[in-house]
């Protein structure tokens, strides 16, 4: 029995250690370092080009800005449910928009609804994802080239990318005005 408890304890500790290193600290091993990075969107001069499988063609952003709040609730409560997001996405598409801009990491309900909507539609909505910038820093004696400001912005940008690719977990309050969880 002692051997069983010791083995289970070691396994639990290893799982917690892996979770902390991979999802919280963002440490991971690239098993394919030589793999070419591919993308379906790029820029040339002042044009945005999108590849839908038939080569790169010019893409015009027709977008809608979306926050995380709903009337009667605090925006940090992330009170919008999946059905509401799906309804909004339909309405946004009906407006003729093809892109949604969000200003910071949302909760998992948004990303799950966004994935579901795009997965079920041949003409998807695209996402422009922002990174929250501290207003105090912007309006104080510091500027965008201040080392501490720049380092924080760079770290938060990396965190957003890692969260969106399912490589990092964040908790409410880790980033200003951010949701929580991992999304993939």
How would you describe each model-predicted region?
Residues 169:
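Ligand-binding clefts/hinges and TM-proximal coupling segments of bilobed small-molecule sensing domains
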Residues 26-119:
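Active-site-adjacent substrate/metal-binding segments within catalytic domains
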Residues 80, 144-155:
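Alpha-helix N-cap and loop-to-helix initiation/capping positions
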Residues 14-24:
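Hydrophobic alpha-helical membrane-insertion segments, chiefly the h-region
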Residues 1-14:
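N-terminal Sec-pathway targeting helices
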Residues 82-145, 159-165, 174-182:
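Aromatic-lined substrate-binding rim segments of carbohydrate-active enzymes
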